Structure formats: C-alpha cells, structure tokens
Regions:
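Solvent-exposed, well-ordered loop and adjacent helix/strand elements within mature globular domains
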Residues: 2-316
Length: 316
C-alpha cells in the first residue's frame, strides 16, 4: 500500500519493485485527478486513521509538485510516496465490471422489469417489497431479464443498449439501506453449489437452470440498487465514489472504513508473488477488511470473464 508520509518505519517507493512507465503514467494521471477533487481531501480528513495516510498539507504539497512536473514523474513519486505493508492476514481480490443490458423506454411483453431511480419511500424496504410495490414515476428504463437486472445491481453501474443499437450510461444513484447478502454464499449453504466452483458464471448458470427457485434465492439479497441516466459525451465508463471515471484494470474498490478513497496501492498476489499498481477509486458493501479489494475490469467483451473468474489471495 502506498501512502504519503515520511515515517521512518516505511519503505521508499522503489524498494519493493520498479514498475513500468505505463503503470507509473496511469498512477500519475489518476493522482492528478485526485488532486482536483474536493471529495478526495474530504475523505482523507474524515478517515478514522487520519493522518496515517498523509495529512492534507502533505497531499497539497505533493499535488503542487505533481502539477509542476513535466517529466520524470517516476522520480517525483519515488521521493514523495512511501510504501507500508500492513501485518493483517491475506485478503481476497475479486473483480467487477460494467455490464451491458438490453433496455427500452416503454414496457411491453419482453421488456417488463423496471430499472428504478432512488426514492426515499424505498428506504429499509426489501427487494421483494420493492419489486411488487414500485412507483411508475420512479421507472427510468425497462429491461428484459431480471437476472441481468440483478447483476446490474451487483455491479453498481452499466450500459443500456436499445434495440436500434443506441447506448445509454446507467449510473449508480443509491440503495435501500439494507445490508448486502451474497447469493453465492446462500447457494453454498443450501448445498446447491460446490464452494470450490462458485463464481459469477456458475451462479448465473444455476439461476438460469433453476428458474422456479431463482427468485427465492435472489430476494435473499435484500439490498436494492437504484440508478440514474448519466449524460456521456465521450466515455461510457462508470464513475467511482470520488465522482471520477474508473480506469480498467487499475481502479479498485476498498473498505472505506479503513482507507480513505483515492490513495494508491500495490496489490501483492500471495501465490505468484506478482505485484501491480492500483488506485482506490471506489467502495462496496461486500468489500470489508485490510486486504480486501475489488478490481474494476472495464466494459469490453473480456471484462465480465476476467471479473467473474478473479478470486485470489492478496495483500495491499
């Protein structure tokens, strides 16, 4: 994990590994974006362990140096950023992606499942209640498949595609303030799936192969996600908790109760020993712990495959 501090007990940036110019470049551009974000500094100061991950003053000084640096960004980061490896047990890194889902502006026999905007009346109401009692005024789009809608909610954002091929950006707007429950764990507990085989694809396959039981499983995750349509002139990428666009295979979701969103990290895989740079742009209800992370894999044709299979032990 990287942090802006001059604590003598932590290591210099290049004491673990020399990263390539491409990774350093993405890190630098991400940190420049953070420097322009008021939310980054607010999150930093609100963190329970402030100023462990760098004080406001430290980061403001670093941001000024980063803005003025036209070349040799790697040298700047090496001199100003330090690495700290926490001593907590290894955690888990998983992946999430931006799904593409069929949508329509009107309801018909095919498109009969509503995508809803946030409304306070749904607070603390279960998934089953909302599915039966939603208000028509809260519908922003219709979709053709409840399972795909369920996983759109799990991922937190997506791209809607109309029958004519036009695309629309579906962004996270809020939730019903009930806790998230993994249906993968439910399927394991009910002996419907082997723990060693559970991933995104085996869960989806089971739901589609067991249509009569599928909804009773999905409704056990009482957390419901609401969306909004976001204007997109250029990029269809989703925005994270800082309001900044997520970077494929670089942005991670972390536990915001431990780390301030926006700080950079090194992910160290336990089995292979390989390391990669990342930056914390997001958070999630299932992401809890010092070494727990969720890597955003993008919205390409391979993004779902990568995210669905990613399940490795790691350190941050």
């Amino acid at each position: 994990m990287l942090l802006s501090t001059f604590n003598k007990n932590v290591h210099s940036f290049d004491s673990l590994e020399s990263f390539g110019d491409k990774e350093i470049g993405i890190l630098a551009s991400s940190m420049k974006e953070n420097c322009q974000s008021k939310q980054f500094f607010l999150n930093l100061k609100k963190n329970k362990q402030y100023p462990q991950f760098g004080s406001i003053k430290d980061w403001e000084k670093f941001c000024l140096k980063l803005e003025d640096t036209k070349s040799n960004v790697k040298n700047l980061i090496t001199k100003n950023i330090r690495i700290f490896k926490n001593n907590n047990p290894a955690g888990l890194i998983t992946g999430y992606y931006q799904p593409i889902i069929k949508v329509s502006l009107i309801r018909n026999k095919e498109y009969k499942y509503p995508i809803l905007r946030k409304n306070k009346i749904y607070d603390l109401k279960t998934r089953a209640f909302i599915d039966k009692n939603y208000k028509n005024d809260d519908i922003i789009l219709w979709t053709d498949d409840y399972i795909n809608l369920f996983f759109l909610q799990i991922q937190g954002s997506g791209i809607g595609i109309f029958e004519d091929g036009e695309k629309i950006k579906i962004a996270y707007e809020g939730n019903n303030n009930l806790p998230y429950k993994s249906i993968g764990k439910v399927l394991i507990q009910q002996n419907k799936l082997n723990p060693k085989e559970v991933d995104l694809f085996t869960i989806k396959f089971w739901l589609r192969d067991n249509q009569k039981e599928a909804y009773s499983i999905m409704k056990q995750n009482r957390r419901y996600i609401f969306f909004k349509i976001e204007e997109s002139n250029t990029s269809m990428r989703p925005r994270g908790a800082l309001g900044l666009e997520l970077k494929p295979n670089f942005s991670i979701a972390i536990d915001k109760n431990i780390y301030p969103i926006g700080i950079p990290f090194i992910i160290e895989y336990v089995k292979s020993g390989k390391r990669k740079l990342a930056i914390s742009h997001d958070t999630g209800s299932a992401i809890k712990g010092y070494n727990r992370a969720d890597l955003f894999t993008g919205n390409s044709s391979d993004s779902e495959k990568i995210a669905g299979r990613l399940k490795k032990k790691n350190f941050l």
